[in-house]
Amino acid sequence: MPPIETGTVMVDGVSTFFRRVHGDGPPTLFVHGNPTHSEDWQPFLERIQGPALAFDLPGWGRSARPSPAEFDYSMDGLARFTGRFLQRMAVEEHSLVVHDWGALVLIGAQEEPERIRRLVLLNAVVLLPGYRWHRTARVWRTRRLGELSNRLWTRRVLDLGLRESRGDWSRHDPAFIDMVWDHLDGGTFDAILRLYRSAPPDRLVAAGAHLERITAPALVVWGMRDRYIPARFGAAYAARLPNSELVELANAGHWPWIDAPEVVDRVIRFLATDEDFPTP
């Protein structure tokens, strides 16, 4: 497999960490969620034929943490930043693989759907009617309470919090906890508060108002034991994307490829095909 290159690039004055696999043809952009970063995508990057890009959003992972007074950490602000990252990396047509808050890139995809070759959604934040934020998100969205809660995070608290991502409340691998914890700091928590507070339910719905414009083949993979995002929203996303296939995983949670490692190869096969519709 092609090697995975790492580096940083300045985008709007923000030092932005990325992982890249070189190759021919339109690249695939992998966009992480909260509270993780581009290392989430390592199993995919190790298997993809290339080309591919994964980056750390400002405030997360190894990217810089500009002050909220200097940077827009809102859903729309991060969506615009992603567009400028693609511009900086000279990316035009591309495929998308998104997880959790990575769904914010669908804002730009609806505006320029002709640039999207293929789309993969993995337990993505819900840009649809009917979603109510989960318990931790409601804390982050509450002024003063969110700031107070962020002072109380420890590795142990993170471990307990991430168990909610699984229906049986089982522990994640300690290496996964370390991967997340090693890059969480005050700048990340500032970004988290501003991101969640920018996204009341009506704004989420508005952000997904034109999902039908994305006619590229789409694969929706949903871990049904996710306690952050209810199982029904996988089918709801698939119903809004006109050229989609839904894969529901009964024994997987919010990070479906961790609980069901075969997801990685399924996604890689989907990205590699040129057929109009997803393949079984």
Feature annotation, model-predicted:
Residues R117-L148:
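Flexible "cap/lid" loop of the alpha/beta hydrolase fold
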Residues M1-T28, Q49-G50, V91-E93, R266-P280:
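Alpha/beta-hydrolase fold catalytic core
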Residues I214, V220-W222:
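Short beta-strand/loop motif that positions the catalytic acidic residue
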Residues A252-P261:
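Catalytic histidine-centered segment of alpha/beta-hydrolase-like enzymes
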Residues A54-V97:
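Active-site loop/oxyanion-hole signature of alpha/beta-hydrolase fold enzymes
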Residues R225-I229:
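Acidic catalytic loop of the alpha/beta-hydrolase fold
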Residues G130, L152-E212:
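Conserved alpha/beta-hydrolase catalytic His-Asp/Glu region
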Residues R20-A64:
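Conserved HGGG/HGGXW glycine-rich cap/lid loop of the alpha/beta-hydrolase fold
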